[in-house]
Amino acid sequence: FGHTFAHAIETVTDYQSYLHGEAVGIGMVMATDLSVRMNLCESDTADRVRRLIERYGLPVVAPKCSASLMLEAMAMDKKVIGGRMRFVLAKRIGEVSVESDVPQGKLDQTLAAGTNLSQG
């Protein structure tokens, strides 16, 4: 959960800008954002994840990342099967779903929000 985004963050920043745990925290925020956009979970769940990560002083956006470069890195992720990206997305706290049918527009919105280009 969060690692598809986290690995892209680490790749795009050449492992120099964020510690692994920081990248995973940002990835968790992005995964729950995408989950909400896909109507898999309630916005309260995403808010709760974000607040928890912020409470520990971890970043929740990756302004040092390019959304387009993240998308390229994600396309090379080991979880890509048959040319389709797979995401571990939240249904609620403690329950996830593996999704490969993610609309490009929703993913683009999540990447824009997660790289601080917009607030989604």
Residue ranges and their predicted role:
Residues 40-120:
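C-terminal charged capping/lid subdomain of soluble metabolic enzymes
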Residues 1-68:
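Active-site segments that bind and position negatively charged phosphate/pyrophosphate groups
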